UniProtKB/Swiss-Prot annotation:
Belongs to the iron/manganese superoxide dismutase family. Mn(2+) binds at H46, H94, D177, H181. It comes from Charybdis feriata. Its EC number is 1.15.1.1. Residues 1-20 form a transit peptide. The keyword Metal-binding applies. This is Superoxide dismutase [Mn], mitochondrial. Its cofactor is Mn(2+). It holds the Pfam family Sod_Fe_N. Homotetramer. Destroys superoxide anion radicals which are normally produced within the cells and which are toxic to biological systems. SUPFAM superfamilies: Fe,Mn superoxide dismutase (SOD), C-terminal domain, Fe,Mn superoxide dismutase (SOD), N-terminal domain.
Length: 224
């Protein structure tokens, strides 16, 4: 219940419960652009089916929330918290995820590279730690590279679709989806193959400032 209330407060501040409907964001690349690491079939299903379902269900939950608030129906407001957390988190997480991926791959540079070297010793160390912790997620969830307000980078995992910032306070920089729909058609049950450090090189050249703005966009109606 405390987590649900915390999520509700953060989501409200972020503009997640706004009146216009959330929409599925366009991808900045074709479905086949990430092959062979991620197949076109997985990308098409993941984006147009799974993410779209989170968007649809989030809109339904927000409509029910608005009705309950107008009626002063506190019981219904409370009962909607899990749906808002799950579908709102799914929408936020995937909106960040698509922007993290790059057809050309690439390595961190500039401000982000300096922060990674400071906090992990090297990019390779960061990738290895991120891969190991993400592979170890039990069931469905996400692995994240994020940072705290002071700027220190941390690796964290979240179960299901729990959004990183609302759950841990970390601002998300780079996320890895380890729900089976993200890899099973291609990698079957061998999750670790997808998460070997060479696969994580799909990470683009992102900056701390750019990623902060990306996270803010992912929680707004206009950016969704």
């Amino acid at each position: 219940m405390l987590l649900a209330r915390a999520f509700a407060r953060r989501s409200l501040r972020a503009g997640l419960w706004c009146r216009q409907k959330h929409t599925l964001p366009d991808l900045p690349y074709d479905y086949g652009a990430l092959e062979p690491t991620i197949s076109a079939e997985i990308m098409q299903l993941h984006h147009s089916k799974h993410h779209q379902t989170y968007v649809n269900n989030l809109n339904v939950a927000e409509e029910k929330l608005a009705e309950a608030k107008e009626k002063g129906d506190v019981s219904t407001i409370i009962s909607l918290a899990p749906a808002l957390r799950f579908n709102g988190g799914g929408h936020i997480n995937h909106s960040i995820f698509w922007q993290n991926l790059s057809a050309d791959g690439g390595e961190p540079e500039g401000e982000l590279l300096a922060a990674i070297n400071r906090d992990f010793g090297s990019v390779e160390n960061m990738k290895n730690q991120l891969s190991a912790q993400t592979v170890a997620v039990q069931g469905s969830g996400w692995g994240w590279l994020g940072y705290i307000a002071e700027g220190a980078l941390q690796i964290a995992t979240c179960p299901n679709q729990d959004p990183l910032e609302a759950t841990t306070g970390l601002v998300p920089l780079f996320g890895i989806d380890v729900w089976e729909h993200a890899y099973y058609l291609q990698y079957k049950n061998v999750r670790r193959i997808m998460l070997k450090p060479s696969g994580i090189s799909l990470i683009g050249r992102i900056s701390l400032q750019g990623s902060m703005q990306q996270s803010k966009n992912a929680t707004s109606c206009s950016g969704a």
